[in-house]
Amino acid sequence: MVVSFVSICGLLLIFNLPLSTSFPVLSDTDVDVLEAILHKLEESMSEETEEDQMVPANSESLEPVGSMKQTANRDQIRPVEVEAIREFLSANTRKNVQNDSSRRSSSCFGRRMDRIGSMSSLGCNTVGKYNPK
């Protein structure tokens, strides 16, 4: 009795083993459906590539995006614009020189600690606003 029960359980396990895998066995109808879908996809992709490859016959008559007049106008810079550019750049350089964050720090603690140290004479650079040397 025990042997027949074990053999029946073993046979059931063997028959159900393919169903428990992560890749189930497909029937013929499933394979046929997948092949039909694949053929439809290939046909639609080939039609799209043919449409993309078609070039219009009047491609020679098309004008370039930038005409010659536009490029010539871009190349000519008025003297007023040159002067404005120079003024802007000189203002930027003045701002960079005057700006505290753009100056290099010579202290051993960094900019913020240097400011605190100069006010309280606790940093490496003790020469400051309230503590003249």
UniProtKB/Swiss-Prot annotation:
The keyword Signal applies. GO terms for molecular function: hormone activity; hormone receptor binding. Disulfide bonds join C108-C124. Keywords: Disulfide bond, Hormone, Secreted, Signal, Vasoactive. Transmembrane segments: none annotated. Residues 1-22 form the signal peptide. Residues 44-53 have a biased composition (Acidic residues). Residues 44-76, 93-112 are annotated as: Disordered. InterPro entries: Natr_peptide, Natr_peptide_CS, Natriuretic_peptide, Natriuretic_peptide_brain. It is found in: Secreted. One of its GO terms (biological process) is receptor guanylyl cyclase signaling pathway. GO terms for cellular component: cytoplasm; extracellular space. Belongs to the natriuretic peptide family. Cardiac hormone which may function as a paracrine antifibrotic factor in the heart. Also plays a key role in cardiovascular homeostasis through natriuresis, diuresis, vasorelaxation, and inhibition of renin and aldosterone secretion. Has a cGMP-stimulating activity. This is Brain natriuretic peptide. It comes from Takifugu rubripes. The lineage of its organism: Eukaryota, Metazoa, Chordata, Craniata, Vertebrata.
